[in-house]
């Protein structure tokens, strides 16, 4: 049984996995996150094996980041959250935005849990809460990109009902219907 509560800008979920909550990312947190995210995404592009990104990865990552978040933390149709554990510690960042490719679909823009909290159910709990949030905002589907060199993430998405709809070699696009 999952209990979801929405209080102002705080969301929380509890079930047998983990008690977590979300708060909307603020401008200061976004500034730190943006620097990390561009670097991290560039590294993933390189690891995905696409040779064209070897020398242009950082530029490509920054360009894509700016397309997604043109107004920073306040970008329209984007919901970026800090994930907090039971003790209120900041343990990750997760978010989605309106898909530029499909009508009525939420596209996951970030899903990262700090290493020391991985493998303990926090990622799954955050994904469940993110889906509930998107569903509450009227989205019928959730879509995401998953790099193939991240098998733990791929397995988590698959176990949570996401299906591969496109394969790009180094990454796949996965989706899940949010409505019954």
Feature roles, as predicted:
Residues 117, 121-129:
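Conserved acetyl-CoA pyrophosphate-binding loop and the N-cap/start of the following alpha-helix
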Residues 118, 135, 158:
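Short polybasic/polar patches that bind polyanions
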Residues 114, 118, 144-153, 170-175:
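Conserved beta-strand-loop-alpha-helix junction that forms the acyl-donor binding cleft
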Residues 2-15, 173-180:
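Terminal substrate-recognition subdomain of acyl/acetyltransferases
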Residues 124, 148-166, 172:
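Conserved active-site alpha-helix within GNAT-family acetyltransferase domains
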Residues 15-115, 129, 133, 166-169, ...:
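Acetyl-CoA-dependent GNAT
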Residues 121, 138, 161:
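Short glycine-rich hinge loops at helix-strand junctions in the catalytic core
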């Amino acid at each position: 049984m999952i209990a979801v509560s929405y209080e102002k800008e705080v969301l929380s979920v509890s079930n047998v996995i983990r008690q977590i909550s979300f708060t909307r990312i603020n401008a200061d947190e976004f500034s730190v996150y943006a620097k990390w995210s561009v670097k991290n995404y560039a590294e993933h592009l390189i690891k995905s094996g696409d040779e064209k990104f070897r020398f242009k990865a950082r530029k490509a990552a920054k360009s894509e980041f700016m397309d997604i978040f043109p107004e920073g933390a306040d970008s329209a149709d984007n919901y970026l959250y800090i994930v907090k554990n039971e003790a209120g510690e900041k343990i990750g960042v997760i978010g989605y935005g309106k898909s530029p490719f499909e009508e009525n679909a939420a596209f996951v823009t970030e899903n990262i849990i700090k290493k020391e909290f991985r493998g303990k159910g926090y990622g799954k709990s955050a994904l469940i809460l993110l889906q509930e949030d998107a569903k509450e905002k009227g989205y019928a589907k959730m879509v995401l990109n998953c790099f193939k060199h991240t098998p733990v993430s791929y397995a988590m998405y698959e176990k949570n009902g996401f299906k591969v709809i496109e394969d790009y070699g180094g990454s796949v696009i996965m989706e899940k219907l949010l409505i019954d």
